Regions:
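Short, membrane-interfacial amphipathic segments enriched in basic
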Residues: 4, 8-24
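Residue-level recognition of pore/gate-forming positions within transmembrane alpha-helices
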Residues: 46-50, 130-131, 143, 201-205
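Hydrophobic/aromatic residues in alpha-helical transmembrane segments
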Residues: 93-97, 110, 145, 181-182
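Helix-loop-helix units of permease transmembrane domains in multi-pass membrane transporters
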Residues: 100-130
Length: 209
């Protein structure tokens, strides 16, 4: 079926160079994800765990039996990233990544995308990149907020918190890239979004037993 049969019309506006294809697909993917109320609620409530971690870590410091013991932010950042990975990042990958390619297949979007000078790499990077960006919002930003709160509350030195934040940044990048690549990859398994969603959930939770 040609793209004209799908209702597309010739575009008479400004044409951007092919090098911007990835950016265009990324913006489209982010816009499509933002229209989901699940994504909006996840981004909204993803800040609750970090506030809890700030309060609990502060309480732990105040009630510490050894006042001379130095505050170590590393385990707190590890627990925070783990909590965000198993909750907010999982939901984002499920809602915006695990059905991305299946959605395009069902709506014949490939006929539109690949009628233009769009390469498979540009398409995949754009689709995966949106999941990565959204996952960074719920992993890296909370880690940064936690580090800033610890500095403001004088829990640990600035140097220790900066080093811990750099370590958490690397962890957030690994988590976000993994979630983007794996979830979008699973979305190519089948045209059925229900199948790809189920496969993603099984992969994510079954290994944890």
């Amino acid at each position: 079926m040609s793209i004209r049969d799908l209702g597309y019309r010739p575009y008479d506006g400004e044409r951007h160079p092919a090098e911007q294809n990835t950016w265009v697909i990324l913006r489209h993917s982010l816009g499509r994800a933002w229209r989901s109320w699940i994504i909006k609620l996840t981004l909204l409530f993803s800040w609750i765990p970090v506030m809890g971690f700030i309060l609990v870590s502060r309480a732990a410091s105040l009630f510490n039996n050894d006042p001379t013991a130095a505050f170590d932010p590393n385990p707190w950042h590890d627990w925070l990233l783990h909590a965000q990975w198993l909750s907010a990042a999982f939901v984002i990958a499920l809602a915006s990544g695990a059905g991305a390619i299946a959605y395009d297949l069902n709506h014949n979007a490939f006929a539109y995308f690949f009628s233009k000078p769009v390469t498979a790499v540009q398409y995949l990077v754009g689709r995966m990149g949106a999941v990565v960006v959204l996952c960074l919002l719920v992993t890296l930003l909370p880690a940064g907020l936690f580090a800033a709160a610890m500095v403001a509350l004088d829990s640990g030195t600035i140097e220790d918190n900066a080093i811990s934040l750099a370590r958490a940044t690397a962890g957030a990048l690994v988590i976000s890239i993994m979630m983007g690549v794996c979830s979008v990859g699973f979305s190519a398994l089948n045209r059925s979004r229900a199948f790809t969603f189920s496969a993603w959930v099984l992969l994510f939770f079954v290994p944890w037993g």
